[in-house]
């Protein structure tokens, strides 16, 4: 009996020591936690087949929520309240709390991500695995941090609900008028309706209006062989024929495929049609942001600064781009080439389901390259492995601007854009990106990462 009593005492003491150790362990949040959380968002965006404009919104709000929590608690950074349209200061926690603000930021990020996608269970499963670990390490800190993160997410979600996204879900579909030869027409193989024709009604973060960076109009539509428009049309056809002839040795085809980023690619087999899974253009640049942040050795707050600034610029870039797309309503090369030059011709890339002018890749890449350059510098070289998961090799770049230029011209190599849409779109995006950089005061002093 005495031996059993002593054994019980030892067990209780051991359990107490173990419990105390577990409950008081620090919860360490690293940049990798945020990289992984954003990778999970990208995975769900691909799974749920969100359009490029909608995907840009999905990236932006979680990054803003996470950034805000850390910015208001770091003297080096500034809150975005009052800088982004309609955003008010996030709730202030009690001074008596034991909040881990990096943990709270990650909670807010995951909560906002969950609210923005269809497959909520994917985020919930990922989140719950982290919650279990954190609770075992320090339940008190975890609970307080979680509750604050959820409170901030609720604040950001309320602000988000005023951006007109919900209203655009019930607006009419884009109307196609086949009797106007210059207007966009649905393209094979899926002949989908035009995607997000009302995206210019979404509230921008920094722009005064969706047409603030309205580009010059495209060349006047004409099928006269000596017209500027026809020359650009013929250029698309001639380039495609040449690089197709070169085949696997064509650098242009490699570039086109690397920057395809079309979540709407459809494959037809017999009477069946199914979609392949691809990253969006914004998702590709979010991947580049991750690569650069890791190479620069950024801590959590600097990592979130890079993600937030870049996703804000891309969100506004898509609004600006889509404003022009459905104003000019320009027909795609594929339609005209099939009707007037070569009825058997197919572009190297599948034509995405929205009007041609301007190139979305060009605008968004231009904007993202400007924000990343403002953070990491003009000559920040990097190896872009973003597309490895989708069966494509690594491509190396000497700067973000060089990557943006390649992303832009890839659309002409792919046979889905005319030269004007590429050149004008890149310029539009660069101007917009520079505006975002100048408009946002996110850091109290300029600190450019070294390569």
Language-model-derived ranges and their functions:
Residues 21-451:
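Acidic/polar surface patches and capping/hinge elements
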Residues 3-10:
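Sec-dependent signal peptide recognition
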Residues 11-14, 449:
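N-terminal non-cleavable signal-anchor helices
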Residues 15-19:
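C-terminal motif of bacterial Sec signal peptides marking the signal peptidase cleavage site
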